[in-house]
């Protein structure tokens, strides 16, 4: 069973808040409030202090690999080495990854990061300035990742954007023009990408810079989040 099949963590927020204070010294004497953020296979919580300082706690799916989570932390740290990118990625606040038992007694990895306060790209009114900001940061990100490689990035992963052929088995879920568009995309991928894959340059990528993983404020991109799909 993979993280895509396993039920996300089931958390009692009050009990988890107590656990946070017991295990992280920077929360021990703080009055904190927790609220849920959007997430698919994990649980993400926003932590607010009375001082208005905010954090994100990521409680990973019980089936998530600890090695893969450590890889994500290394990836974020590498991106933050670039002075032009440092503020675009959350700062990792935990010294090591701890584990919390959820309500079903499953062992779930816990990580603490700074919170990037803004709106999701999907819910923002974006302008040419926003698009230019996005293009510039994606280019800087790609350049920075050229000097980063770990074994964990080289993996078999269903959502690998360099091989979309697996989507063909779902094509009959669509009809008409939508089906034709998808079929043409798969055919062009087969012809121009997959047949030439060995001749194309490779590098570690974010893997999923979709419009719910990009943070915007005042028509400017201020953050990239969620590196769970990163791949070489």
Regions found by a protein language model. Name each.
Residues 40-50, 56, 90, 190-232:
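Active-site acidic catalytic loop and adjacent metal/ATP-binding pocket
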Residues 123-180, 202:
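A cross-family kinase active-site recognition segment
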Residues 37, 49, 100-108:
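Short glycine/proline-enriched loop/turn "hinge" motifs that connect secondary-structure elements
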Residues 59-106, 124, 128-132:
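A conserved alpha-helical element in kinase catalytic cores
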Residues 1-31:
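Juxta-kinase regulatory segment immediately upstream of eukaryotic protein kinase catalytic domains
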Residues 26-48:
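ATP-binding glycine-rich phosphate-binding loop
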Residues 106-119:
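Conserved short submotifs of the Hanks-type protein kinase catalytic core
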Residues 22-31, 187-198:
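Short Pro/Gly-enriched beta-strand edge/turn motifs at strand-loop
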């Amino acid at each position: 069973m993979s993280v895509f099949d396993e039920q996300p963590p089931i958390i009692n927020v009050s009990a988890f808040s107590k656990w946070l204070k017991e295990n992280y010294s920077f929360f021990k004497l703080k009055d904190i409030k927790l609220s849920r953020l959007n997430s698919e296979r994990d649980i993400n919580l926003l932590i607010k202090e009375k001082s208005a300082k905010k954090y994100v706690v990521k409680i990973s799916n019980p089936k998530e690999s600890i090695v893969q989570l450590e890889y994500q932390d290394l990836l974020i740290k590498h991106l933050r080495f670039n002075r032009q990118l440092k503020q675009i990625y959350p700062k990792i606040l935990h010294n090591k990854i701890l584990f919390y038992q959820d309500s079903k007694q499953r062992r779930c990895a816990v990580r603490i990061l700074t919170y990037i306060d803004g709106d999701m790209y999907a819910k923002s009114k974006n302008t040419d300035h926003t698009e230019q900001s996005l293009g510039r940061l994606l280019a800087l990100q790609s350049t920075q990742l050229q000097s980063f490689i770990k074994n964990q990035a080289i993996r078999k992963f269903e959502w690998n954007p360099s091989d979309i052929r697996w989507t063909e088995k779902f094509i009959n879920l669509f009809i008409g023009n939508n089906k034709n568009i998808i079929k043409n995309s798969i055919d062009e991928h087969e012809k121009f990408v997959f047949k030439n894959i060995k001749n194309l340059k490779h590098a570690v990528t974010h893997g999923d810079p979709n419009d719910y993983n990009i943070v915007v404020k005042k028509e400017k991109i201020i953050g990239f989040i969620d590196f769970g799909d990163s791949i070489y």
